Regions:
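Beta-strand-rich binding/interaction modules
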Residues: 195-197, 514-515, 521-540, 598-602
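Extracellular Ig-like/FN3 beta-sandwich strand-entry sites
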Residues: 565, 594-598
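Low-complexity, Pro/Ser/Thr- and charge-rich linker/hinge segments at domain boundaries
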Residues: 461-487, 613-647
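Contiguous beta-strand segments within globular domains
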Residues: 489-526, 530, 567-569, 640-643
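Beta-propeller blade termini and top-face loops
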Residues: 1-500, 509-510, 543-545, 554
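Glycine-centered tight-turn motifs at strand-turn-strand junctions
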Residues: 536-590
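Mature extracytoplasmic or organellar-lumen-exposed domains after removal of signal/transit peptides
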Residues: 605, 612-614, 645-779
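Short acidic/polar inter-strand loop motif in beta-rich domains
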Residues: 576-580, 604-612
Length: 779
């Protein structure tokens, strides 16, 4: 039997003990400090079920002893901070280890472990976002660096580790920066350390307010006390100003070179709770145990000088003059609690929300409050949130007043009546603690404690929900969209679930997403998109469009007509170009994207219409003009028309050829019709020769394009592909090449006209004279 014992660290009495007689007698076999140095956070011992002399200890390092605990070696190959180990009783070479980075499996006794990079198990703290495009999400990640990750990959379909980078500070960082120019990021870590990171150079400097090595110190002896997750924020009103909180609130105007104290101690300053952590045995002085500290700071974005603070010992304060004077506005019934988040309403400067919890006191009651008078009076708003769902954060929607989102210990809740009542809104979100929420650019971003970041990409269905309007026809308002590159599984309109690697996240949809609510039994449904001139740029229906010689509708998406909410994604492209059967052409048949502007989207359901506006903007990173978009659109339209005309003509002539051959089969045994047979065979040869100037019939597969010379339509599609990008960039070469190809097509059009007006006309005349059915050019 092995026992890992924490004891008085000053007397060196702890360590690993072993009993060989079932616990009657014990001997200490190791006093290695690594085994017991952080007993508050972890120390777990595991005996091998097969080999009595093999024992494992989980701590900052994973340790293994093969001699009954006398000597130790590190378990390598995975993350640090180990908490748990499972050993297969039937095969002790098979183990599963758990640490702050996830879990790993071994089948050879720990020589090799499986990767942990395929597990979305990050524990994130507080969220911040910038206003770049695509915007970035920032947060501190437990037992790792702070993180910055893009909300979209504009060069692919998934957000991968290439869109990720480290940011300022450490694992427990709040991150502050100018959201419009986030070059300089201020990030914290435990015990009040702060880094100012220049993201352009990658260089960081320390700007700690009072650079003292606080670790192992009693909080009551510290000059300033900082929470493990000490707040840092960039001012919404004063350019270049950052705030940082310990037990006081601090302000810097010179990038951290100097700090001004702008508040008294905003905690209870209860010195009885500022002694040695881990008492009475092991001093745990890492910083996570500091008490009487400020846990949250919120600067009002509606009023300059209005700042709220919350502390881990249950106090809420406000200043309305930039810190000159402070008022204790703590809700009377709150008591000792961690004030975890504060939200100022984006719609009313006097309305403020507070989220608090007491789970550290073994009380899992949800606590959330609302005030409409700057905190003078409070109303508790937790109806519908059950016991156990401790509230960590509340955010109000920045578009719909009174729509609230609550992140709790067990998931997400929403309220449509300003907190009077709440409903669970979990959907596919894992049941996991939500540590922070942020409403940004039509997205709801969630930081979780163990399941990484989650983003709800499209908030308009939630914002537009009206319980009294269920069963009615509604076309939901649309949000602004940007023309972007990349793609997404959410561009699909199918019911199937697209798969992507679990080491990545799916992009948000790359076009416009339309939501519409339908009553029962809608039979006919269409969506029509018009530009500012009233031209229809695209239309869709719930019924597949019929396809003739122009088969561009072959893969046209179809609108769903289910009762309730329906979703339809449009990629902002016009109708695609028709294809040619049994010919491989390297290139895309996709139509061009619409130019930035305002469009009208009209939904028609069984004769009833509703319309809304769609604003399409350029990628803000692209420095271009409306004239350049128009020039691109104009040339692409010409190229698309030529491809369409060529492929429709070829398809129709193929249909005509088929008729001629079928007619020949019927009359070729009749000598009196031999002239018709001869004329028909000659015409088929002419049509084939004409077609082979337009397409390459020998091109049947991908590699054929390097074996057989491209013909006219492939050359036009190539120019179209060169130009049909997100950036409007029309070159002289593209215009000249179009002119050459168009002139070539005009020649072949004349040949086609001659075939139809002379050869086919003469054939039909001879057929009529000989009582043979004539041939008809298909539609």
């Amino acid at each position: 039997v092995y026992a890992l014992v924490e004891s008085d660290t000053e007397k060196e009495q702890g360590g690993l003990f072993v009993s060989n007689d079932g616990g009657d007698n014990w001997n200490r076999v190791s006093k290695d400090h690594r085994l017991i140095s952080r007993a508050w956070y972890y120390i777990e011992v595991f005996a091998d079920p097969v080999d009595e002399n093999t024992v494992y200890v989980m701590g900052a390092a994973g340790l293994k002893s093969a001699d009954g605990g006398k000597t130790w070696s590190n378990i390598s190959g995975t993350h640090g901070d180990y908490h748990q180990l499972w050993i297969n009783k039937a095969d002790n070479q098979n183990m599963v280890i758990a640490n702050d980075g996830g879990a790993a499996v071994t089948f050879n006794g720990g020589k090799v472990w499986s990767t942990q990079n395929n597990q979305p198990t990050a524990q994130f703290y507080r969220i911040n976002v910038d206003n770049l495009f695509p915007y970035n999400i920032y947060a501190g990640q437990q037992d790792n660096t702070s993180v910055k990750i893009a909300s979209r990959n504009t060069s692919g379909g998934n957000i991968t580790d290439r869109q990720w980078s480290y940011s300022a500070g450490g694992e427990s960082a709040f991150l502050g920066f100018d959201p419009n120019d986030p070059r300089y990021v201020m990030g914290g870590s435990y015990q009040g350390t702060i880094e100012l990171l220049d993201t352009h150079t990658g260089e960081g400097v320390g700007v700690m307010i009072h650079p003292v090595q606080y670790q192992a110190m009693q909080p009551k002896n510290m000059k300033y006390r900082f929470n493990w997750n000490a707040p840092i924020l960039y001012s919404k009103h004063e350019k270049g100003v950052y705030y940082h909180a310990g037990n006081h609130l601090f302000k810097t105007k010179d990038m951290g070179k100097s700090w001004e104290v702008i508040s008294p101690d905003l905690t209870t300053h209860d010195t009885a709770k500022m002694g040695i952590s881990g008492f009475p045995y092991t001093n745990e002085g890492a910083g996570g145990e500091n008490y009487c500290t400020i846990t949250y700071v919120m600067e009002s974005d509606r009023e300059n000088g209005v700042i709220y603070t919350g502390s881990d010992d249950g106090l809420v304060h406000v200043t309305r003059d930039g810190g000159k004077s402070w008022t204790n506005i703590t809700p009377k019934e709150l008591g000792e609690a961690v004030v975890n988040a504060i939200e100022v309403s984006p719609h009313d400067p006097a309305t403020v929300y507070v989220a608090a919890h007491k789970y550290k006191l073994n009380d899992f009651t949800p606590f959330a409050y609302k005030s409409t008078d700057y905190g003078n009076t409070w109303t508790k708003i937790v109806t519908g949130i059950p016991y156990g769902a401790c509230v960590r954060v509340i955010r109000e929607d920045d578009t719909r007043k009174g729509l609230l989102y609550a992140g709790t210990e067990t998931g997400l809740y929403i309220s449509y009546n300003d907190g009077v009542s709440w409903i669970n809104f979990q959907r596919n979100l894992p049941v996991t603690p939500i540590t922070d929420l942020k409403v940004h650019k039509n997205n709801l971003i969630a930081a979780t404690q163990g399941r990484s970041f989650w983003v709800l990409d499209e908030l308009q269905p939630i914002r537009s929900f009206d319980a009294s309007a269920t069963g009615k026809l509604i076309l939901l308002p649309m949000t602004e969209v940007n023309r972007v590159s990349g793609y997404s599984i959410f561009d699909s309109n199918g019911e199937e679930k697209a798969k992507y690697p679990n080491t990545t996240a799916a992009n948000p949809a790359t076009g416009a997403v339309l939501y519409y609510q339908l009553p029962d039994s809608v039979k006919s449904l269409t969506i029509e998109i018009k530009d500012q001139n009233g031209e229809v740029v695209r239309s869709f229906s719930n019924k597949p469009k019929s396809s003739n010689s122009n088969n561009s509708f072959r893969n046209e998406p179809v609108l769903t007509v289910k009762k309730g909410l329906n979703r339809f994604a449009w990629n902002l492209r016009r109708q695609g170009m028709p294809t040619i059967d049994n010919v491989y052409i390297e290139g895309s048949y996709a139509g061009r994207k619409i130019v930035p502007g305002t469009y009208t989207v009209t939904l028609k359901a069984d004769g009833v219409e509703q319309s809304t506006s769609l604003i399409v903007k350029a990628d803000p990173r692209i420095n271009t003009s409306a004239a350049e978009f128009s020039a691109q659109d104009e040339l692409l339209a010409k190229l698309e028309k030529d491809v369409t005309d060529i492929h429709v003509a070829v398809t129709r002539m193929r249909g005509l050829t088929k008729q001629i051959k079928e007619m020949v089969k019927l009359v070729e045994q009749d000598n009196s019709k031999s002239e018709v047979v001869t004329m028909s065979n000659n015409i088929v040869k002419k049509i084939t020769a004409w077609e082979e100037k337009l397409i390459q019939p020998k091109s049947q597969s991908y590699d054929d394009v390097i074996n057989f010379v491209n013909k006219l339509s492939a050359n036009v599609i190539f120019v179209h592909g060169e130009l049909n990008g997100n950036v409007p960039y029309v070159t002289a070469g593209q215009k000249a090449r179009y002119a050459e190809l168009h002139a070539e097509w005009l020649i072949y059009q004349k040949e086609l006209d001659e075939l139809l007006n002379k050869d086919i006309a003469e054939l039909n005349a001879r057929c009529k004279a000989l009582s043979v059915a004539n041939v008809i050019l298909p539609e």
